[in-house]
Design a protein with these regions (language model features):
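Non-heme Fe(II)/2-oxoglutarate
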Residues: 1-64, 68-71, 79
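Low-complexity, compositionally biased segments
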Residues: 9, 20-22, 88, 114-117, ...
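Catalytic core of non-heme Fe(II) oxygenases with the double-stranded beta-helix
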Residues: 65-67, 72-145
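Terminal, low-complexity interaction segments
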Residues: 144-153
């Protein structure tokens, strides 16, 4: 089993205003991309103009390494299948969550497929992996900013 530091760490010193981010989320008119074929078990993403979150990005020692910022959502009563992508890490900043929503890490016990990204009528091939057989290794509540190891399912 992996050490907790291998999967994620909280970033409590990161300062942001949840209401401002939520308003930015509501007013963002870009299209949602869906990683997968069905709404209820897919991750939905939308790019954010980095100028809107510059005050957050500039809190990092090397803000130039941040190459994109996205909003993520899951559908009400939905789940996101175990997955990984081509990034090494992601910084997740919760805007609207509750303490019953867990982020879970897994160990792959079998094969995976590569879900398409669905953006409107377009399908985009991705290197993301959706795992078919997994074993849970860690669970935590994402109720504050955290850096996640996104190379793990």
């Amino acid at each position: 089993m992996m050490n907790i530091q291998d999967n994620y760490f909280y970033i409590p010193e990161l300062k942001y205003n949840q209401d401002e981010l939520y308003n930015s989320y509501l007013n963002n008119d870009r299209d949602w991309a869906r990683y997968g074929n069905q709404d209820h078990n897919s991750l939905h993403t939308k790019y954010v103009d980095t100028k809107e979150v510059e005050h957050i990005i500039n809190q990092f020692k090397r803000p130039e390494i941040i190459d994109n910022v996205k909003f993520f959502k899951t559908m009400a009563n939905g789940v996101v299948d175990p997955h990984s992508d081509n990034r090494n890490v992601a910084i997740n900043i919760p805007i609207r969550t509750n303490d019953s929503q867990n982020t879970i890490f897994y160990e792959s016990k079998g094969d995976y497929d590569n879900p398409d990204i669905n953006l409107g009528d377009k399908k985009i091939i991705t290197n993301a992996k959706r795992y078919n057989k997994v074993e849970e290794t860690q669970r935590f509540v994402l109720n504050q900013p955290a850096c996640l190891n996104t190379s793990l399912p």
